[in-house]
Amino acid sequence: MSFVLAIDQGTTSSRAIVFRSDISIAARAQAEFPQHFPASGWVEHEPEDIWTSTVMVCRDAIAQAGISAKDIAAIGITNQRETTVVWDRATGQAVHRAIVWQDRRTADICAKLKADGREPVISEKTGLIIDPYFSGTKVAWILDHVPGARARAARGELMFGTVDCYLLWRLTGGKVHATDATNASRTLLFNIHTGQWDDELLEIIGVPRSMLPEVKDSSARFGESVPDLFGGAIAISGIAGDQQAATIGQACFRPGMMKSTYGTGCFALLNTGTTPVVSKNKLLTTVAYQLDGKRTYALEGSIFVAGSAVQWLRDGLGIIKHAAETGPLADQSDSMQSVYLVPAFVGMGAPYWNPRVRGALFGLTRNTGPAELAHAALESVCYQTFDLWAAMRADWPSSETASVVLRVDGGMTASDWTMQRLADLLDAPVDRPVIQETTALGAAYLAGLNAGVYPEPTKFADNWRLEHRFKPNMSEATRERKLAGWARAVKGVLASDEGA
């Protein structure tokens, strides 16, 4: 039997999962690593921590599976997107800590780009908005704030990469400087229409082309690991950013299929096929995956607060001790009350993109208690998903006639209550898969596809297994009343922003 090793390098931990040829899991390992917050709004990682934790979990997973390097057909990598590393081409030493996707230090750079009228051309070419979230301005900041870095970059001495690229470079002993199209599409430097780094974008943001990696298919022979890492060389044959990898792991290969990943926040992607749809509703247009030189696109929406709303119930209010208590508690709520939580704890993401507003509760009465607050917190995740759903269907009219499928993954999907309410408010089935490790599975599939372990996408999709389908069970009148109440609550929060 052949095995595939998936590296899932995340924001707070590195994970490795060994998949069998039938996509069942043979072993898994995880290791957390330190977070660094040197200033307000700044988030950094030590690149060496990313590297050492990744190697450690790979070795642990291989040992747990009772296999050796010769049994592993390929390695697939998936990663926290946008996080930026710049290192010395000769020594391999990072010139600065990795600047994490959450980091907001480049807000002034972004504001200047907008003030200079650069957003239309950047958005048209990249499908993104100008925001510190993305890699390009992070690279520019490093070049301008590390002494001598910009001059060194101009001389070709420095390399840039997202986390996948950095790991690939280290795994191959510094032989391969490459990334895939999904990660490239999150940099503000990549033209999603041509599939290439864009000279105009590089000039606008101030990043030398010599720093950039080669962009390849998501399933491709990137190189092989140096033998002394895992007891033998292993082909590295698949790379994708974490949300795109989850889309692949959910087998969302048909246009109109949509996945939502629920963790601290929520990321939803809608497959739009070979057409890059330009959003008119503040969604992002991104590369879902690239196979055989052909790009498949997606609309993406980001929700900042999903699972963290439940954490707030536990840590902020103290009304629960464990997340699993929220569903039963919500079931006890008074059906006559209409309490809405708009959880804009750190502003609002798509489709509103307002970083200034803050959260609010609406509809409180003397009888409002823990059950009603739990109900409102769980429903807020569903309402926010509905907003993304509605924006996506407005941006891509084909979804009105296509068979729209919502597949969910992430820790919060363990809540049957939340998933049922999600189906009710979307008026669409919500599918929860048997394999919840969808992000790692996506990376494994891309690697295994290139290595000949896994079949082409349509056949792989046949192996996707449903654990539970949540079917809508709410009257149209109730659904419309509840959604109208949510819309009023959001309007109230947005109106509270003096800059609105």
Swiss-Prot record:
Pathway: Polyol metabolism; glycerol degradation via glycerol kinase pathway; sn-glycerol 3-phosphate from glycerol: step 1/1. PROSITE patterns: FGGY_KINASES_1, FGGY_KINASES_2. Belongs to the FGGY kinase family. Glycerol binds at R81, E82, Y133, D242, Q243. It comes from Bradyrhizobium diazoefficiens (strain JCM 10833 / BCRC 13528 / IAM 13628 / NBRC 14792 / USDA 110). Keywords: ATP-binding, Glycerol metabolism, Kinase, Nucleotide-binding, Transferase. One of its GO terms (biological process) is glycerol metabolic process. GO terms for cellular component: cytosol. This is Glycerol kinase. Sn-glycerol 3-phosphate binds at T11, R81, E82, Y133, D242. Its EC number is 2.7.1.30. Pfam families: FGGY_C, FGGY_N. It is an enzyme of class 2 (transferase). It catalyses: glycerol + ATP = sn-glycerol 3-phosphate + ADP + H(+). One of its GO terms (molecular function) is glycerol kinase activity. ATP binds at T11, T12, S13, T264, G307, Q311, G411. Disulfide bonds: none annotated. Inhibited by fructose 1,6-bisphosphate (FBP). Coiled coil: none annotated. Key enzyme in the regulation of glycerol uptake and metabolism. Catalyzes the phosphorylation of glycerol to yield sn-glycerol 3-phosphate. ADP binds at T11, R15, T264, G307, G411. The keyword Ubl conjugation does not apply.
